[in-house]
């Protein structure tokens, strides 16, 4: 709470510093409708993950308990240990998602859709170039990471953690791609699509987790469900970007022919 409070205070100070600077030319102020068009979808996108994690924890814990397993311990190793390790490289690539927005949004707002899409695809390629080595490293060095970060685990718990990290190592790629592609869709002026994909992904993740646990996959089923959900999210986001680019090029060709 304190860290978030200091972060918010620092952001306000930076904003006030920028606000007090007088621009060389008068700027047109954005209306409330234009602001809400972006802030509302972004807000719903941000709350999708916590809501899905809460739902997943309830569903997974109850199903694991009904199967006669140690629900709290098993899901705790997944959410508290495996996800923590996976999120370390994902947090690095989050910077690419944040940095891509200021470069893509002006191009999209000016009508240069082709350049905006090219910038989006470039950001995605950079994300891939960083995430793939991280994914390989997670798979190869999962035992070492488990020993260093979570030394208090028993041998059986450590072995489970290593299996979960190796299963979810692909998430370093798919989750990173989902973040960057979602940010690119928002910058391209289609934040509602990014929000819809995020909520569908979360629902798919919870549903698949319940299915796999009921089929006897135990907590590994939650990890597999996460892999499938984020792969679908990354693929759909990329498809949206490529599809819109193709539609834009087709529209330009039609206008030229007219």
Predicted features and spans:
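Helix-loop junctions and terminal segments of transmembrane helices
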Residues: 90-110
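Membrane-interface junctions at transmembrane-helix termini in multi-pass inner-membrane proteins
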Residues: 172-200
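Interhelical loop/hinge segments that connect adjacent transmembrane helices in multipass membrane
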Residues: 12-46, 244-258
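Short membrane-interface helical motifs at transmembrane helix boundaries
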Residues: 133-155
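Alpha-helical transmembrane segments of multi-pass membrane proteins
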Residues: 154-181
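Membrane-interface helix-loop junctions in multi-pass transport and translocation proteins
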Residues: 1-9, 192, 202-235, 242, ...
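Interfacial transmembrane-helix starts/ends
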Residues: 32-36, 79, 112-129, 133-141, ...
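Helix-terminus/linker motif at the lipid-water interface of multi-pass membrane proteins
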Residues: 47-88, 106, 146-154
